[in-house]
């Protein structure tokens, strides 16, 4: 697992407005996680619920939605888990793959990833 931080802009699927945040890039997490109050402020409502495995162990049901993210000049719609009120924003492996990015383990920065096909 590799971690670093990245400035991103978070918005609803229609891209009508964005909130800048510094997100933890965590390749051990599957999806993006954003604090629920921030998502609500942006007008993002949960679309579905599902079970998630928690880092310290155990699992719980959480709400999910699709959000619009901007990283640099690139924009993409990704799956996001509604975090707790004080959750740190997180970019997970699914988010990085959607943007075609990976973590450069030497620098901790995000770099283009090679896509693999069967």
State where each predicted segment sits.
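Pepsin/retropepsin-fold aspartyl endopeptidases
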Residues: 1-118
């Amino acid at each position: 697992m590799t971690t670093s931080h990245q400035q991103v802009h978070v918005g609803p699927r229609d891209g009508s407005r964005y909130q800048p945040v510094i997100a933890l890039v965590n390749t051990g997490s599957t999806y993006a996680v954003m604090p629920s109050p921030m998502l609500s402020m942006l007008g993002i409502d949960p679309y579905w619920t599902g079970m998630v495995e928690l880092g310290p162990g155990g699992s719980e049901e959480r709400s999910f939605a699709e959000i619009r993210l901007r990283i640099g000049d690139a924009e993409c719609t990704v799956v996001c888990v509604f975090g707790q009120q004080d959750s740190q924003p997180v970019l997970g492996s699914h988010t990085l793959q959607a943007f075609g990015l990976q973590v450069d383990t030497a620098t901790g920065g995000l770099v283009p990833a090679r896509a693999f096909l069967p």
